Amino acid sequence: MRINILRVEYHSKTAHSILLQLDLFKKVKVICHMSQSIKFRVTEARQRDVGKKVARISETSMRKLNVEAGDYIEIIGQDGNSALAQVMPAYDISDDEIRIDGYIRKSIKVGIGDDVTVRKTNVSPASKVVLAPTQPIRFDNSFVEYVKDTLMDKPLAKGETLPIPIYTGTLELTVVNTQPSNYVYVTGSTNIEIREEPVKESSLAYPKVSWEDIGDLEEAKQKIREIVEWPMRHPELFQRLGIDPPKGILLYGPPGTGKTLLARALANEIGAYFITVNGPEIMSKFYGESEQRIREIFKEAEENAPSIIFIDEIDAIAPKREDVTGEVEKRVVAQLLTLMDGIKGRGRVIVIGATNRPDAIDPALRRPGRFDREIEIRPPDTKGRKDILQVHTRNMPITDDVDLDKLAEMTYGYTGADLAALAKEAAIYALRRFVDEKKLNLDQPTIPAEIIKELKVSMNDFLNALKSIQPSLLREVYVEVPKVNWNDIGGLDNVKQQLREAVEWPLRFPELFTKSGVTPPKGILLFGPPGTGKTMLAKAVATESGANFIAVRGPEILSKWVGESEKAIREIFRKARQAAPTVIFFDEIDSIAPIRGLSTDSGVTERIVNQLLAEMDGIVPLNKVVIIAATNRPDILDPALLRPGRFDRLIYVPPPDKTARFEILKVHTKNVPLAEDVSLEDIAEKAEGYTGADLEALVREATINAMRSIYSMCDKQSRDECKGNMECYQKHIKECMNKTSFKVSKEDFEKALNVVKASLTQADIQRYERFSKELKRAIA
């Protein structure tokens, strides 16, 4: 008998039962293709995929699952919870990894590194979807249409929470009901209903902060997961090894780098009970109350284990006991030590402390058994800044010209908080521009959705925002550097080239220095006569390199209090390291670093020199920090500063020769209307011995001479016209001065040459050239 082979594909028990009912199962040989399922290890989602119900796997895995880009898959956690996603290819992960965001991870109760099962699934088109916000909102039909557009083709299931991007933030909507009631996806014919009454916040198990909300900090995230997440999720591993998990972690670093965010994300990812303690809130003037509060916090944590106690600004409640005069602080520290030693069920309660002053914390807390690990949270590098900008712009409508790579390069020294503020400020600029362009009336109750869709943030908005957001690390020492380019400095080509090599090259071509095996120069000393452009060169270096710029005026460092001057130097270098790449510019360095042993003061300058030597060539390396110093008295500088390893480059800034004087005059007269009889070459030849500052003064004086001539003419005309009427005279002379065009003539320059004299004599020039030769011999 001939047996027909019927090829049937099915994904549920329904097909099986139908075959039995038709009594075909016994008569027909069935080849059933069950939906293929594969196990994957969970990794973080890309920023662009957060909240979009996208799962990314390798192309090889997609072929194994028999899915194409955009198909729907079911992701099943270890305890059977499942979620839907659209599958997309990833080219930067292995075949056993899957990228899913915090919303999907939370709904199926898995964390980074856990295993999930993935299979292709059938999803029905939705006829109706009912949503509810998690907080009270006002909305109109245009918002409903916007939500529908956002959710188009996205797979949905009852009970899940969806983040809807709203300008710089998100609004969470919960899926209350769907028709049909199984897995569905939104189509053009789907009826979207949004209820006004919000669902209860407590009923939601979705994260407010996930790992994807933290740009950068990959190393810190990995360390903190090893210390906290592994013991809480898999205590049996530590029991097998016969070791106790850590009790505490101290996160330290500058303000705004993400310490608090890191702790919150950790608690959300592992589903731990989270208690936030702000250090100063613990303190009380009543005897024993501060200690009682701490005991209650630890008791609450143990009752709700697994839990995390996060103590922000821990230095406020646990300072060094020998440094404080109050008894309250000492008792609080003692209580904290006792409670951390007495934590039961290690690995179930973790204490995380955060501070930007780790040295101020009592040493007894900083030993194994209390704060077992200390993790430094550093300001982000260029790649980290780009990651952070991606986090803060992922829900922002931006134009195609927004270049996050360029913005990351321009924001040296910016912390995560600074970059968040930058994104918000750019959005405000865009809003202001949009309102002006569209002439919107903000008093009207609603703005049409089609107009709102045109609102986008441009690169120009970010550049404008950069002007008002300063890096917080340098706020105390930040200097707004005037925009000075190399072209604004006439002559000095050799000096400019040396500065480019020492400062710009290491920042622009770091790989070149890595390959060569040499370290860039640490320090550059510019010396020469006054007025030759030393400070101007430092400004140009800061502008052209794009590095952060700290200007230190020598005399400002000096203090009558013992140790204050050295502390000021230490703080400057500490901030420079944190905000690297940084240029520290010491103007008039001879005032704070003279030859030791010769000064008659109380020894403050000697201590400053010692501190400078230690900072420039000490144990702590100067990574991407360049020191530029300027002086016109190199003969009185301490010799120890002038050796290689401190000031590696000693650059003589000479007075300009004739060619350089011509270039300087061209720079200073580029916006000055010159008469045809003016020859800058002739003026440059006559200005022998003039420095750059002298030539600037010469041009200024010549211009004022021309203005004097205009004033004399206008004064005569006004007096003749107004005949003693003072009100008429003031009005007439103002109009005359503002309307009359003028040009600076050769005669004006001749008069100026008689007024502005050269500040350098031949003897001065010879003396500085002698200094230059002596210094070169000294360092040779």
UniProtKB/Swiss-Prot annotation:
InterPro entries reported for this sequence: AAA+_ATPase, AAA_ATPase_CDC48, AAA_ATPase_domain, AAA_lid_3, Asp_de-COase-like_dom_sf, ATPase_AAA_core, ATPase_AAA_CS, Cdc48_dom2
PROSITE patterns: AAA (PS00674)
Binding site for ATP: 253-260, 528-535
UniProt cross-references to SMART domains, sorted A to Z: AAA (SM00382), CDC48_2 (SM01072), CDC48_N (SM01073)
Entry keyword Lyase: no
Keyword terms of this UniProt record: ATP-binding, Nucleotide-binding, Repeat
Gene Ontology MF, one: ATP hydrolysis activity
Protein purpose: Not yet known, shows ATPase activity.
Family: Belongs to the AAA ATPase family. CDC48 subfamily.
Name of this protein: Protein SAV
Gene that specifies this protein: sav
